[in-house]
């Protein structure tokens, strides 16, 4: 009998618009899709990508400036040593994928699905990538919220990294006491207030009336755990819920999701 095909669904923001004070736009964060994709691909999982609308554009700071050539743009990302909210510089392999549009990664991106067309029964892992764009669209992405909840209730693993946990408070399960978020009573982490402040992005959050994730997740009943190093690799697993604190945690978050599964 052939082995069962294992499937991962990577969810990301479909917002692409103003955020940074240098005039650049936020969007889906490149490495937070690429790194999990590479982990799941190497584990022989089939990978699909989904957004609420099916559209994806990458955060300008995640595909240019400090992520590739430090100092060329995005100066606020260069304010905290060399760790920066965008994570390390792209490696040669990562640059190759970014520049080689024939790579399978780009085929999956170009064939991204809309949330309302996806069958949740197909997927073992629901992985949520970040980028500040999630703060704009995830609270209203009702089909994406329902999709992730269904995968979780089917016994799947839900993982989210950096600003990806923005979706989690809106993923509701039914209990005898009514509807509660899947993070209620769970240990979680995410890109927190300290990281936002050290990245000098609090002003932008206030400008666009966006909530910091510490508050959002605590308000949903989660036990928020801060990373000891705002830009260091940090992952929390609580049952079938896995969260990572920043872009540097994307690979570890994906690997932990596989171990939990």
UniProtKB/Swiss-Prot annotation:
Top enzyme class: lyase
Which top-rank group of organisms is this from? Eukaryota
| Record-annotated active site | 162, 163, 196
Q: Which UniProt keywords apply?
A: Lyase, Stress response
Pfam families the record matches: DJ-1_PfpI
Is Lyase tagged as a keyword?
A: yes
Q: Where are the transmembrane segments?
A: none
Question: For this chain's UniProt record, which GO biological process terms are given?
Answer: methylglyoxal catabolic process to D-lactate via S-lactoyl-glutathione
Gene3D superfamilies reported in the protein's UniProt record: 3.40.50.880
A molecular function (GO) held by this record is: glyoxalase III activity
Under catalytic activity, the entry for this protein gives:
methylglyoxal + H2O = (R)-lactate + H(+)
Signal peptide span per the entry? none
The UniProt record lists the EC number as 4.2.1.130
Question: Which Gene Ontology cellular component terms are annotated?
Answer: cytoplasm
Q: Which InterPro entries match?
A: Class_I_gatase-like (IPR029062), DJ-1/PfpI (IPR002818), Prot/Nucl_acid_deglycase (IPR050325)
Q: Which family does it belong to?
A: Belongs to the peptidase C56 family. HSP31-like subfamily.
Q: What does it do?
A: Catalyzes the conversion of methylglyoxal (MG) to D-lactate in a single glutathione (GSH)-independent step. May play a role in detoxifying endogenously produced glyoxals. Involved in protection against reactive oxygen species (ROS).
Name-wise, this protein is Probable glutathione-independent glyoxalase hsp3103
Its source organism is Schizosaccharomyces pombe (strain 972 / ATCC 24843)
The protein's gene is named: hsp3103
